[in-house]
């Protein structure tokens, strides 16, 4: 308050607290130029940092409990940001004055539109979903389905070059979202780039399961996913050796598949690439906050009723880890400013989440996240084969950015 008083009397004073680099909540000049809002901003930053440091200094907590306390304290602090409230956000106040409050009426309409009429769940729109259409301006690379079963369709994309690589390329996306993360727009499509390099690309497009697939296991995802794809690719191309890429949980499945194939002396995948893949779950980052026996049991009870985990529930978990960017920025834009979200292909894909079969997902969370069994030789058994990652001898490239 002393620095604010000095500024209000015409003096110069350095701010006591400033936002961290990358914090876009206070980017508008009003947060610094207006003495009142600068005071509100600095008071919030000082208080939130004090609260977080106080909680961090609590004694007697194990690392896991301390991580949970820190995580939820930060979510609490984010929710109380002055940028999230009409009276303390100068940008919203200006918009309200200029529009005569029309922004708040528009925001209420947006809020009602985002509320699920059946469940009451709030699904905050992150992008203009009407601006995108599968096959028109996202997932536009020309391909054909060459194989399908209960869990996936296999899509083939032919190379666009005169010289063609002999080995086909199999891409295994995660099944928590759709495959077209690899094929958003032509300018940022990995598939477009790969076929332009002479690769014959095959991509697994996972099914969005319902209760009929509740008993599907991780064994089934391996057998009916990559292993079924290998046979279909050989039938389509005549090539038995196939390079593979796994992304996120698709990469975890690729690691399981390679260990399974190594045990059976199956050499059809001579090289593997992993994009942002967890194999050792010892340090699962902030996701570990949601993994303990009590929370898993509650999750399993919810899944047992439906036969699957709703995609929106998984998406909400990931959004919480970046609350300012993936929750509160859209609350401000959609509900306080009354604006429609901006068209953004990546956020359209991010919102297009899929369900997960209860049996498979329970096994995955317990064996990977809770028990970290994948790194133990024989810790996980799929299709009767005890997996040992040490037996994987194929060249592997891993990228985690």
Question: Which residue stretches match the model-derived regions?
Answer:
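Amphipathic, low-complexity, repeat-rich surface-exposed segments
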Residues: 1-152, 164-165, 202, 309
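Short amphipathic alpha-helix adjacent to the substrate-entry channel of hydrolases
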Residues: 183-201
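Short beta-strand element of the alpha/beta-hydrolase
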Residues: 164-175
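Short beta-strand immediately N-terminal to the catalytic nucleophile in serine-hydrolase-like folds
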Residues: 244-246, 275, 399
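Alpha/beta-hydrolase-fold enzymes
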Residues: 62-94, 235, 239, 257-361, ...
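Short beta-strand/loop motif that positions the catalytic acidic residue
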Residues: 392, 398-400
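Alpha/beta-hydrolase fold nucleophile elbow
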Residues: 230-250
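Alpha/beta-hydrolase active-site loop
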Residues: 213-237
